[in-house]
Design a protein with these regions (language model features):
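Residues that cap or delimit alpha-helices
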Residues: 6, 44-45
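N-terminal basic/disordered segments at the start of proteins
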Residues: 3-11, 15
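Concave beta-strand-loop units of leucine-rich repeat
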Residues: 12-42, 51-65, 74-87, 91, ...
Length: 291
């Protein structure tokens, strides 16, 4: 009746978010991801061990939201279109730890509509929030008062004001941010104990060096940094396990990665001037290395 899919790469951390930052895509922990389509029949029953639920509806609206999902006690992660908002407390599963709101596939006639979370619906168990597409500059109305224990945020900063809401989530440990432009995201979030940071689509002048505020960093992903990166700066992160530098063409002191025994994964794409000998040494010393 339903199409079972393995959890996609972008979801591999969701099941144990806040508990184990790496190696969480083991099949015994992963659960099933269901794509729910309007013409595919009934929802899973209460007895089904469904960990992930994703809705794909041709023309979604709140009227399409199935209240039955509140009975799925095993449900940990839910992905829904923003057209389902606002929801009531009775419509949401109690044990949800991850919520994805999809604002990518908006109909033209809905372009001027502003969908927003019901501020009376609190989600104290929620640890991961992902917004796909425009967050309307206010995280679709989701504030620290609504989600006080949020650990993971994933959103694109189409509106720079969004960063001022994000910095108020006191328990935040992971910030996956796109469309950062020149917003000094690391300076805004320096008071947080971030373990995972990702910055996509920066513009010239973006200050990547402020990543140094996060001494407990375990995973860092930087995309399209225009300025030269001195790789020796990563030596200040004693817990760094995974590093991705994508389309960061100007790198120096790349050999510094040989001095990082904790580093288990290094991915450098489209960088210039790294010798074959150094590439070979990096691959010999780092378990997962693509240079």
């Amino acid at each position: 009746m339903y199409k079972k899919l393995i959890v996609k790469e972008r979801d591999k951390y969701l099941f144990h978010i806040g508990r184990s930052w790496l190696n969480t895509d083991d099949s015994t922990n992963r659960g099933d991801l269901f794509d729910i389509r309007k013409d595919w029949g009934d929802l899973p029953s209460e007895e089904d061990k469904v960990a992930f639920l994703s809705f794909i509806v041709e023309k979604p609206s709140l009227a399409h939201f199935p209240n039955e999902i509140a009975r799925l006690s095993s449900l940990k992660a839910l992905q829904i279109p923003v057209q389902f908002l606002p929801l009531s407390e009775e419509q949401l599963p109690k044990h949800l730890i991850s919520l994805t709101l999809d604002n990518l596939s908006r109909e033209e006639e809905q372009a001027d509509k502003h969908y927003s979370w019901n501020p009376l619906v609190k989600m104290e168990n929620l640890e991961c929030l992902r917004i796909l597409g425009d967050d309307n500059g206010d995280l679709l109305g989701i504030s620290p008062e609504v989600v006080p224990n949020l650990k993971w945020i994933e959103v694109e900063l189409f509106n720079p004001n969004t960063i001022h809401i994000i910095k108020e989530f006191k328990c935040l440990e992971a910030a996956i941010l796109g469309e950062v432009g020149t917003v000094d995201i690391f300076a805004h979030l320096k008071h947080l104990n971030l373990k995972i940071v990702s910055a996509k689509s920066p513009k010239k002048g973006f200050d990547y060096t402020n990543i140094s505020y996060f001494k407990g960093l375990e995973i860092a992903r930087l995309f399209s940094i225009k300025e030269e990166i001195d790789c020796a700066m990563f030596l200040q992160f004693p817990h760094l396990k995974e590093l991705l530098l994508h389309q960061c063409k100007k790198l120096k002191n790349v050999e510094a990665f040989l001095e990082m025994p904790v580093l288990k994964s290094l991915n450098i794409e489209d960088a210039k001037g790294i010798s074959k000998e150094l590439k070979a040494s990096l691959k010999e010393h780092i378990p997962q290395c693509e240079v």
